Amino acid sequence: NLSDDLSFNFDKFVPNQKNIIFQGDASVSTKGVLEVTKVSKPTTRSIGRALYAAPIQIWDSITGKVASFATSFSFVVKDEPDEKIDGVDGLAFFLAPANSQIPSGSSAGMFGLFCSSNDSKSSNQIIAVEFDSYFGKTYNPWDPDFKHIGIDVNSIKSIKTVKDDWRNGEVADVVITYRAPTKSLTVSLSYPSDGTSNIVTASSVDLKAILPEWVSVGFSGGVGNAAKFDHDVLSWYFTSNLEANQSQT
């Protein structure tokens, strides 16, 4: 009998971490940091993903229940002082079909989630929150003209964004909540160093219409042409609860 509640917590990580599936260049350092993309030079075109090993039931076709969930994590993105490119390309938290794999051609601004042949297709069945540290119309024409937090549904072109000035080497704390009754997804990012925070909310995000019943959750990241650029997750908490959908349609 599966419980309607699920939660897990990683205060830190260990090499060859149990309960985490590593894809591409993702790994855990001896310092207990989840390194989503390649660390050793060159990091150019590195892609990595780290997923919680157990699939999570996000809705139930029999009972009609849809999960509310919350996740919190701390991360750092950093490049070397002599790096000529400012921020390439970013980190994302995502939900995707269980046992999902990295698509071919999804490095750089595609975050290891999408590629040109599948972008915007409902068959992707992906919801992601991207922390995009690079913008440039030449390479990423879908992006707004600023570094940002974006909520993505089946496409690298975000449905909602808010400006966020990426800070090289600084810890960022993130809280993401989804409320099933209101179908609202809210993202809050704050910098403990000075308390600055940004919030973005998307309404009418219908998990049942977008995702399969069972999903994998985790992190993905991509690097473009930067020779040395790191995406590090320091800690991660996740909890979900299947509940009867109270909203009437």
UniProtKB/Swiss-Prot annotation:
Keywords: Calcium, Glycoprotein, Lectin, Manganese, Metal-binding
Positions of Ca(2+) binding: D132, Y134, N140, D145
Pfam families membership: Lectin_legB
Gene Ontology terms, MF aspect: carbohydrate binding; metal ion binding
Residue positions binding Mn(2+): E130, D132, D145, H148
InterPro entries, per database record: ConA-like_dom_sf (IPR013320), L-lectin (IPR016363), Lectin_LegA_CS (IPR000985), Lectin_legB_Mn/Ca_BS (IPR019825), Legume_lectin_dom (IPR001220), Leguminous_Lectin (IPR050258)
Glycosylation (residues): N118, N245
Keyword Zinc-finger part of the UniProt annotation: no
Functional description taken from the UniProt entry: Di-N-acetylchitobiose specific lectin.
Similarity section: Belongs to the leguminous lectin family.
PANTHER family tied to this protein: CONCANAVALIN A-LIKE LECTIN FAMILY PROTEIN, LECTIN
Protein name: Anti-H(O) lectin 2
Annotated source species: Ulex europaeus (Furze)
